[in-house]
């Protein structure tokens, strides 16, 4: 038995989320686990985290256990023949037998895409959030700086039973001029995130960018952990899971 780390890219538009669910809902985990026996693997895949319906991923890590002797370099091609068009394996490697995709992650990173132009884009309607009005990027960057470090982020999250304290290692804004127009990209990196935290932060930052609230208003949200003080949850389709990092010793068989 070998344990493999798979990196999966997916378009979340037609998925009911990452995590396997009942009632016949289509999920990323469900589709991957359905394909695994086709390469001689056990039908169980453990992800680095979970994404909601409509959220995309560039390289979501999963660990799986393989009983067959299939060479690891052939795993992506073999699995991709069995997977749907909106879910593909883009990398595979053998890892330590006790490697755990969720528990061993040192950090995880997300990106949120915002298209800023006068008219919506049919091509990016499932890939980026459209905003008609120009954004005050300087104010957004000031607000982003307040989020860095260790705080109670419950004020940005969905209903949570877990403690809200998390450490945000990196929070930055990038601007790109793409074919569709000006794109603002928000990047967040931390060891772990609360459910809905990233989209809650984005929704609040958008209010800052649109002049609906001052940057310093985020201080009260972090201090009180009151969700009512934050902005709305940003739509799922602009969010991407980018990557996760692991200790080198866990990545060696």
UniProtKB/Swiss-Prot annotation:
Keywords: Isomerase, tRNA processing. Its EC number is 5.4.99.12. It holds the Pfam family PseudoU_synth_1. It is an enzyme of class 5 (isomerase). HAMAP family: TruA. Homodimer. This is tRNA pseudouridine synthase A. It comes from Thermus thermophilus (strain ATCC 27634 / DSM 579 / HB8). The lineage of its organism: Bacteria, Thermotogati, Deinococcota, Deinococci, Thermales. The gene is truA.
């Amino acid at each position: 038995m070998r344990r493999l780390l798979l990196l999966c890219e997916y378009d979340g538009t037609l998925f009911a989320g990452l995590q396997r669910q009942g009632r016949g809902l289509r999920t990323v985990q469900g589709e991957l686990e359905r394909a695994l026996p086709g390469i001689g693997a056990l039908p169980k895949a453990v992800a680095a985290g979970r994404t909601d319906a409509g959220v995309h991923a560039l390289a979501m890590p999963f660990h799986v256990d393989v009983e067959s002797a299939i060479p690891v370099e052939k795993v992506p091609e073999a699995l991709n023949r069995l997977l749907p068009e909106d879910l593909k394996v883009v990398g595979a490697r053998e890892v330590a037998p006790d490697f755990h995709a969720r528990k061993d992650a040192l950090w995880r990173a997300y990106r949120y895409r915002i298209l800023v132009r006068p008219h919506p884009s049919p091509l990016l309607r499932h890939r980026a959030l459209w905003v008609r009005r120009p954004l005050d990027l300087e104010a957004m960057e000031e607000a982003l700086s307040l989020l860095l470090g260790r705080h109670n982020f419950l004020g940005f999250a969905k209903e949570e039973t877990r403690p809200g304290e998390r450490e945000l290692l990196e929070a930055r804004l990038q601007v790109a001029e793409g074919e569709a127009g000006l794109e603002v990209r928000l990047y967040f990196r931390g060891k772990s995130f609360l459910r809905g935290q990233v989209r809650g932060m984005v929704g609040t930052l958008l209010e800052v960018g649109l002049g609906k609230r001052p940057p310093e208003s985020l201080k009260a949200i972090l201090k009180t952990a009151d969700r009512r003080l934050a902005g709305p949850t940003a739509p799922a389709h602009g969010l991407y899971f980018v990557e996760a990092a692991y200790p080198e010793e866990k990545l060696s068989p």
